[in-house]
C-alpha cells in the first residue's frame, strides 16, 4: 500500500490543491464534524529549526482531529546533539507516530525522511527549499478573497532564500496566474526555480521596485529577508530594510488589493498597514488550522487506503 507525503508544491495538481481547499472550507464551516475523526492517532512534530505558527497550527489541527501529538523539544536536548543522523531519527520516530511533520535546515531533508519511513511525511520547511503546507493556506486565503482564476500576484522581498516563495510560485502556475517578482538583484529567484517556472510555460516577470507594478496586482505577497540563510552577515545588512511598505505606499493600490505575509515580519510591513483593508496576514495565519486539518485528514485517509488527495513523492 503506497503511503502519500507532501514534500513539494510541485507535486500538487490543481485538482489536488482544490481537494484540500474544499475540505478546508468544510472543516471551517463545520469543525464539529471533524472532531475525533482520527482519535487514537499520533502526529510527530519534528522541528529542527524554530517555529511558532507552523508548529502550533499543526499541533492545534491534529488535536482538533482527535489526535495526540509528540515533539522533540529542544534539538540540543535530543539525540541529534549526540550525532544521530536524520535517517535514524525519523526511522525511530516512525514507530511512535502515524504521521510526521518535519522542519529541517537542510534542503532535501523531507525527501530523505519520506524515503526512510512508511508513514505520511509533511515538509514544514527544508532550508531554503519549500514549504508546501504554507502554500496551501496561502492559496486558501487568496481563494476566499479573490478566487484563484485570472489572478495577478506580486511576490516581494527575499526571493532567493524564501521557501514560501518557491512553493507559492510553483503552485500558482496550476492556475495560470500572472506573477511579478520584486526583489534586489542579489535576492532574485534562484535559477533552478526560474527554470522550473519557465518549463510550465509561466511568464517570469522580475522587477527591482514595486511602484511600477503595484496598480496591476490582486495580491501582494511580502516576505522578510531571511537573515539566518545569509552566509555573509554584511550582505544581509546591505539589503535589510530595502523593501518595505507602509500605508502611504498603498494609497495608489487597487481598493481590493490583498496584502499577505507568511510571518514572522520584521520591518517589511509597517504596523500602520494593519489598520488598512488590505491587511490579510493575520487571517492568513489563522487559516492554517482548517487547511492543516484538511491536509492531515486527507493524508491519513490515503494511508488507510481510502480515497483522497493523491500526492506522489
UniProtKB/Swiss-Prot annotation:
UniProt: carbamoyl phosphate binding residues: 53-54, 103, 131, 134, 263-264
Gene3D superfamilies per record: Aspartate/ornithine carbamoyltransferase
A single GO BP: 'de novo' pyrimidine nucleobase biosynthetic process
UniProt superkingdom: Archaea
Keywords: Pyrimidine biosynthesis, Transferase
Pfam families: OTCace, OTCace_N
Residues where L-aspartate binds: 82, 163, 224
EC code(s) of this entry: 2.1.3.2
Annotated metabolic or biological route of this protein: Pyrimidine metabolism; UMP biosynthesis via de novo pathway; (S)-dihydroorotate from bicarbonate: step 2/3
Catalytic activity: carbamoyl phosphate + L-aspartate = N-carbamoyl-L-aspartate + phosphate + H(+)
Function: Catalyzes the condensation of carbamoyl phosphate and aspartate to form carbamoyl aspartate and inorganic phosphate, the committed step in the de novo pyrimidine nucleotide biosynthesis pathway.
Quaternary structure annotation from Swiss-Prot or TrEMBL: Heterooligomer of catalytic and regulatory chains.
Protein name: Aspartate carbamoyltransferase catalytic subunit
Lineage: Archaea, Methanobacteriati, Methanobacteriota, Stenosarchaea group, Halobacteria
Amino acid at each position: 500500500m503506497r503511503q502519500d507525503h507532501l514534500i513539494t508544491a510541485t507535486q500538487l495538481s490543481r485538482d489536488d490543491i482544490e481537494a484540500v481547499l474544499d475540505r478546508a472550507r468544510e472543516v471551517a464551516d463545520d469543525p464539529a464534524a471533524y472532531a475525533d475523526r482520527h482519535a487514537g492517532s499520533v502526529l510527530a512534530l519534528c522541528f529542527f529549526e524554530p517555529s511558532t505558527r507552523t508548529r502550533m497550527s499543526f499541533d492545534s489541527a491534529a488535536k482538533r482531529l482527535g489526535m495526540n501529538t509528540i515533539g522533540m523539544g529542544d534539538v540540543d536536548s535530543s539525540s541529534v546533539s549526540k550525532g544521530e543522523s536524520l535517517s535514524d531519527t525519523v526511522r525511530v520516530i516512525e514507530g511512535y507516530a502515524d504521521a510526521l511533520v518535519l522542519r529541517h535546515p537542510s534542503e532535501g531533508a523531507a525527501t530523505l525522511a519520506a524515503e526512510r519511513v512508511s508513514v505520511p511525511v509533511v515538509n514544514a520547511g527544508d532550508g531554503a527549499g519549500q514549504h508546501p503546507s504554507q502554500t496551501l493556506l496561502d492559496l486558501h486565503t487568496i481563494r476566499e478573497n479573490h478566487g484563484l482564476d485570472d489572478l495577478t500576484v506580486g511576490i516581494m522581498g527575499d526571493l532567493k532564500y524564501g521557501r514560501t516563495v518557491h512553493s507559492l510560485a510553483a503552485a500558482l502556475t496550476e492556475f495560470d496566474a500572472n506573477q511579478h517578482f520584486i526583489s534586489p538583484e542579489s535576492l532574485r529567484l534562484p535559477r533552478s526555480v526560474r527554470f522550473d517556472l519557465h518549463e510550465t510555460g509561466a511568464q517570469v516577470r522580475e522587477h527591482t521596485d514595486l511602484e511600477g507594478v503595484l496598480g496591476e496586482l490582486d495580491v501582494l505577497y511580502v516576505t522578510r529577508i531571511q537573515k539566518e540563510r545569509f552566509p555573509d552577515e554584511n550582505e544581509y545588512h546591505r539589503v535589510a530594510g530595502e523593501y518595505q511598505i507602509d500605508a502611504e505606499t498603498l494609497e495608489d493600490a487597487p481598493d481590493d488589493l490583498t496584502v499577505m505575509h507568511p510571518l514572522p515580519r520584521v520591518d517589511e510591513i509597517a504596523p500602520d498597514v494593519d489598520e488598512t483593508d488590505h491587511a490579510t496576514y493575520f487571517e492568513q495565519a489563522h487559516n492554517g488550522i482548517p487547511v492543516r486539518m484538511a491536509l492531515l485528514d486527507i493524508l491519513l485517509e490515503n494511508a488507510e487506503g481510502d480515497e483522497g488527495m493523491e500526492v506522489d513523492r
